[in-house]
């Protein structure tokens, strides 16, 4: 391994750690394309990214827990279904051809941009209904209702589409499958699904997501390690950088407006999807 590659891996790890704390993703959305660009096989990129994510997510979640922003019961409810499906994802990753693995990863990024926008519209609709009820003098609103309001100030269950238990199982299962299949912690699907199905604010979804990623990434990495796909030295370098980056970003997240965090998350997904589609095309035409 050259000095240049070593520095690139360390810098990428720090950047992924910063994204983990700010956006609730393990960093796989950045690390997988980077490792593919460094000529690692897609299945190795997926597996090694998972190892890095374990270290990064543990670092960020410990910091969130110390600051009182992490609900362990919520993490457990979403995380345990992910343990089983992560093994399924790790198995499928070894079967798919490289170009198909990258293509479906890019489609996943696009899907998440759409899900976040859907949730944004639903939240706006619910807030408008509450505002209309206040103007009509509905009981229970009174002097304590102030605008603008947050998700947590909406009426109970008004912001939840499905039963919470079902929503947690569905969210965790999807996250685990993606963790094993694509080498992501699952945050790219957990954040929008928590917002969409559980009615969480984006900051709460991010903090819970990072905690769940600890579980999903460990499970997925174990599955890949059993198949010999993990590059341990590369993963530890990335993880060391991620540990530092996550400590910084988790301290700053509570100070940022939800609108800025949401815009940053969607912008990142859009840029990465373009790169991943290009990589998929290159793999396809080169056989």
Language model features: what each stretch is:
Residues 49-53, 209-213, 234-239:
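Short hydrophobic/aromatic, small-residue-rich stretches within specific transmembrane helices
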Residues 1-16, 34-38, 42, 63-178, ...:
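Juxtamembrane transmembrane-helix boundary motif
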């Amino acid at each position: 391994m050259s000095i240049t590659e070593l520095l690139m891996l360390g810098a990428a790890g720090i950047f992924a750690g910063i994204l983990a704390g700010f956006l609730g993703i393990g960093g796989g959305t950045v690390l997988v394309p980077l490792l593919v660009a460094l000529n690692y096989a897609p299945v190795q990129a997926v597996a090694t990214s998972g190892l890095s994510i374990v270290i990064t997510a543990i670092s960020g979640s410990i910091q969130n827990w110390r600051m009182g922003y992490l609900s362990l019961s919520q993490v457990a409810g979403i995380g345990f279904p992910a343990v089983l499906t992560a093994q399924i994802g790790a198995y499928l990753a070894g079967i798919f051809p490289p170009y198909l693995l990258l293509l479906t990863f890019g489609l996943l990024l696009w899907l998440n941009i759409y899900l976040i926008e859907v949730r944004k519209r639903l939240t706006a609709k619910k807030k408008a209904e509450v505002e209309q009820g206040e103007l009509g003098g509905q009981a229970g609103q009174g002097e304590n209702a102030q605008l603008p309001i947050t998700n947590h100030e909406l009426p109970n269950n008004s912001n939840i589409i499905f039963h919470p238990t079902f929503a947690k199982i569905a969210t965790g299962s999807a996250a685990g499958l993606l963790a094993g299949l694509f080498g992501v912690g699952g945050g790219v699907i957990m954040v929008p699904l928590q917002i969409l199905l559980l009615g969480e604010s984006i900051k709460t979804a991010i903090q819970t997501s990072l905690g769940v990623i600890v579980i999903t990434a460990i499970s997925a990495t174990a599955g890949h390690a059993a198949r010999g796909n993990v590059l341990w030295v590369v993963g530890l370098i990335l993880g060391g950088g991620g540990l530092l980056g996550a400590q910084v970003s988790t301290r700053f997240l509570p100070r940022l407006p939800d609108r800025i965090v949401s815009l940053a998350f969607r912008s990142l997904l859009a840029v990465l999807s373009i790169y991943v589609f290009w990589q998929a095309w290159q793999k396809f035409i080169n056989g």
